[in-house]
Amino acid sequence: MDSDHWISRLMAAKRQYALQRAQNHHHATATATATAASHSHLDRYGYDDVEPEDEVRPDFPCPYCYEDHDITSLCAHLEDEHPFESKVVACPVCSARISKDLLDHITLQHSYLFRLQRHHRLRRVAVPSNHALSLGGRDLQETYLKVLLGNSSRSSGTNAASSVTDSLLSSLVLNLSSSEAEDTAKFSALAVVENNWFKRTLPSKTWKASSDSNLSQEERERRRRRAAVRSSFVQHLLVSTLFDD
């Protein structure tokens, strides 16, 4: 009796184990099929591999009010909200102690962050590849040949060609619109910063007449050099942002 009891329990355990293995295998097969179908769909419409959003964009706290900003908005924030701060603070990027002109320190010593931010933004954009464009061209050619050979009606051929064209245009517009909007916002913020820099660093004739008389020759020369450095940096930043790959 005891042996029969243990044999029955062993057989039940084996059946339960086999059932669990079958269920796990079915689940793994379904998951692999769904993943392959998703990849096939992306390949069909020609999307390049897009890096996942696991890389978080670095935020830098304002050392005066402790608000978090990315590097571009931080510069605009310092220019607009804290243009005349003179207390010693730590640079949010390198932790160096800066007594004044924190904005100048960031833009001159950490200008590479602007380019890194732009490259990271471009990597996140999914753009149809050349393979997608070639597939779209072949689809249009096949549809056109079908219409010429009479394998499909004129209306169906026209609708198929229109659908292929619309899908390509839609994919381009949907994927580029978000990056274009973000680029426009960044360029607008950069233009504001540039405008304020030029207003602050390029003195007018009235300013020269009223203020230069109270400054020494060395101080006036130092301010001119700083203005030239800022102007050169702004020009380099704009050119690298617009044309650098």
From Swiss-Prot:
The superkingdom of the source organism is: Eukaryota
Q: Which family does it belong to?
A: Belongs to the Di19 family.
What is this protein identified as? Protein DEHYDRATION-INDUCED 19 homolog 4
Pfam families, alphabetically?
Di19_C, zf-Di19
